[in-house]
Amino acid sequence: MSAETAARAAVPPTSLPAAVLFAVVFVEGFSSLGAEIVALRRLVPHVGSAITVTAPTIGFFLLALALGYQAGGRVDGDYLARVRRNFLYAAALISLGLAGPVADALFAHLRPVPLAYLVLVGAVLCPVAWLLGQTVPVLTNLLRHERAGARSGAALYWSTLGSFLGSLSLSVLVMQWLGVAAAVLVCAGLLLLVVPFIRDPAAPRWAGVPASLAIAAGAVAVNVVLPQQVETAYATYRVAAAPVALPGMLDPRVFWVNNSVASLIDGSEPPRYSRYIERLRARLEEMGVRNKRILVLGAGGFTLSHRTTTNDYLYVDIDPAVRELAERDFLGEPIRGDFVAADARQFVAGSSARFDVVVVDAYSALTSIPAHLVTREFWRDTRKLLEPDGVMFANLIVDNRLATPYARNLLASIEAEYGRCGVEILFHDRPQSNVLVQCFAGPPPQAGVPYTDEINRADVDILRSQ
């Protein structure tokens, strides 16, 4: 041990009241996990919420946190200044890097999309985890316990308690009632709030205050003053004019959900809608569906029942706010039908009601159907909701040749429960198309047997089919 190191070790570390130290560690746990939750929510409009997105994001976050623990364990002096500086940097990254306009601009201008994802996670979320991860090992040096285990146990208790309350309060309360921007401000604000208390008792009281005020002003400017999309815990919404002229439509308006076109309506009388909605409405008319009960899983803009009175509609969507937003900003009038705020999988699994028609039109982002709504078990539950002569329609967005693994396997999952279904490709001039799938209730028919030159029962089967 060098003389300098020995002298530094002989000087007792500057201490703070235990309540202040535990409060700082609590805020670290709250804001670090809060930043992860906000980052996952910011990713939804751009890359969805599939396990292939959330799992790597959590993994990168934990890796950065582990590296932060290691870096904090190597700090051998000036503990409070280190934590104070880390809190300021983390607050700046959270308030600016996780702001809605910044995330939207990042994904709008960086291509391909995985590059924007890596920038958001690698340049914003991971540095936050690394900075805040240093807090517990650094401040453990200042806790007054007889045993090292008691010190680390107390610090980890308050940090984990903060993470628990942060995940609960931000997801269930703040995002639900105030929006995602409010969650960003809460995470950054708590870090800035404790910065003035992270100082040596002999240091000036205003240590860190000017920087905190500057970061707070920037946070408010980016998360409040700049134009924001309507955000809830589940989705990001906006209503705008169609970005391009649409043939046959007069002043079309688009209801955007998570940066994808959820619904379309124009100013004609009667109004025109998106092609798959018009095709589905026409199909119901052709089938003579009148005075029937129709279940729609995934509300979108509620255009399937717009200005119709011939059937009873029940919409199910996970976001309680979508009805008010659609009525106020998109339709300009009350929806036709009833609305239930629930997860579609949970609803179909627990409902005892029966419907003449079930429409599956649920998307989380772009062309992404939530993963739990594509399984064979989900389609089995939808079939259980149908009347004996009922019909199920599903709006899929897949390649127009139905050749990708996703398209093939999704159709296979549906037909594993329903048997052979009708498939109508609505767009043939673009790689991705709306595909309308129509299936019928009842037990699926027997699997077909190919005709061959050796055994060809085509003529017999024609007679059997008449």
Residue ranges: model-predicted function:
Residues 431-466:
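SAM/dcSAM-binding transferase cores
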Residues 2-233, 238-251, 258-262, 281, ...:
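Alpha-helical transmembrane segments of multi-pass membrane proteins
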Residues 249, 265, 447-449:
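Short acidic, gly/pro-rich beta-turn/loop elements at beta-sheet edges
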Residues 332:
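Conserved helix-loop functional segments at active or binding sites
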Residues 263-285:
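Class I SAM-dependent methyltransferase Rossmann-like catalytic core
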